[in-house]
Amino acid sequence: MKSSGKPLAAPKVGMVSLGCPKALVDSEQIITQLRAEGYEISGTYDGADLVVVNTCGFIDEAVQESLDAIGEALAENGKVIVTGCLGAKKSASGSGLIAEVHPKVLAVTGPHAVGEVMQAVHSHLPKPHDPFVDLVPAAGIKLTPRHYAYLKISEGCNHRCSFCIIPSMRGELVSRPVAEVMLEAENLFKSGVKELLVISQDTSAYGVDVKYRTGFWNGRPLKTRMTELVGALGELAAQYGAWVRLHYVYPYPHVDEIIPMMAQGPLKGHVLPYLDVPFQHAHPEVLKRMKRPANAERVLERVQKWREICPDLTIRSTFIAGFPGETDAQFETLLDFIREAELDRVGCFAYSPVEGASANALDGALPDDVREARRARFMEVAEEVSAARIARKVGKTLKVLIDEVNAEGGIGRTAADAPEIDGVVYVEPAAKASKRYKVGEFVSVKITGADGHDLWGEV
């Protein structure tokens, strides 16, 4: 059979990605597989033959946002496959929530289900056949800017926090093989990534499910454990002049082993002095009802010890105010903890019942206005603490990774600032050509000003 000479148009798939960075990585993996098989990615509904919507189902607002996004995709395109956490959520009747609200979707899967998503895509939009073209770089397709990327090291969680339903949606902890993680990290650095953000549901638990099994990387043994993984990632980052940033670090004892890497030796400046630790509360009774580790005094001692070892350490955390049964005195204990721990970056949610969470059955539910008032008061205190710590940086010269360049100068981040969630540095335009900077470059910036959240500086 003779060829017509015209290449067949590749089928196009649209992608809508909602939720946390872990869901973003799932979306990246789906897009990578689509491109590997020859599909094109469409940035518009009307330019796509089919749309995949990756959902979030953690809190009620996220559920509604996901349902709205599915509805919009159905209205604008008509052919929709749904994946993500909301896909695992049941309705009050016990059936799948998405199928009940949007019965016209083509298929529904749960989270981290690339294979199932691809099967659904194949069923409704057969893949093209072009074995002569490799469309995908080794680093995969990323939705983040080229100079930073998320590295997911595990999926699922073994905790059973009373306010959370993530384990019921994402399952028990499953750690990725250490060699697979290291290979992905190496490919990302080779592709030009300057900042690697390590994520999971519980980074500290990496390897627990496989009893810290020893794997191999570049011919040498490497234990499937957070400490050893961070050390290896730091060594790799040093080869490429890059950063490694740790997120979702539960305060297990072996976290203490990471702090010296941040403070001294060859990994200093590559394993960033930054910990994202979800403390959630500080009063032992509230923590007990949350089914969280309940030794707040010990946590405070450890935070202070970490800072003795690594004075530049930045600690980010999240908290819940107005949890069922929280008394005025218990809330004041939380505020005292924030002041004493001097946390750098803090987020706080007013407690909100989540369908399926065991906390819904607890006594002592607080009125909406009390919960919101406590959240607002918490943030007032947290912002005072944060502003005081940020002000200490004025006059210092800091290493900044440039995220954006425009007519007014540049916008970048220091080691203390993760993308999207922390502050930024507004950098004045370079006065000399020799000092001009580009996106993805590290520059030395003298800090000239600060507000409660961001910094200003000049090269």
From Swiss-Prot:
Stretches assigned to the TRAM domain: 391-459
Radical SAM core domain mapped to chain residues: 143-388
UniProt EC number: 2.8.4.4
Keyword match Cytoplasm: yes
Class in the EC hierarchy, top level: transferase
Cofactor info, note text: Binds 2 [4Fe-4S] clusters. One cluster is coordinated with 3 cysteines and an exchangeable S-adenosyl-L-methionine.
Molecular-function annotations in GO: 4 iron, 4 sulfur cluster binding; aspartic acid methylthiotransferase activity; metal ion binding; protein methylthiotransferase activity
Keyword GTP-binding on entry: no
GO biological process, alphabetically ordered: tRNA modification
Protein localization: Cytoplasm
Binding site for [4Fe-4S] cluster 2: C157, C161, C164
Cellular compartments per GO CC: cytosol
Major localisation: cytoplasm
Domain spans labelled MTTase N-terminal: 11-126
Its job: Catalyzes the methylthiolation of an aspartic acid residue of ribosomal protein uS12.
Family according to the record: Belongs to the methylthiotransferase family. RimO subfamily.
Full protein name: Ribosomal protein uS12 methylthiotransferase RimO
Native source species: Burkholderia pseudomallei (strain K96243)
Taxonomic lineage: Bacteria, Pseudomonadati, Pseudomonadota, Betaproteobacteria, Burkholderiales
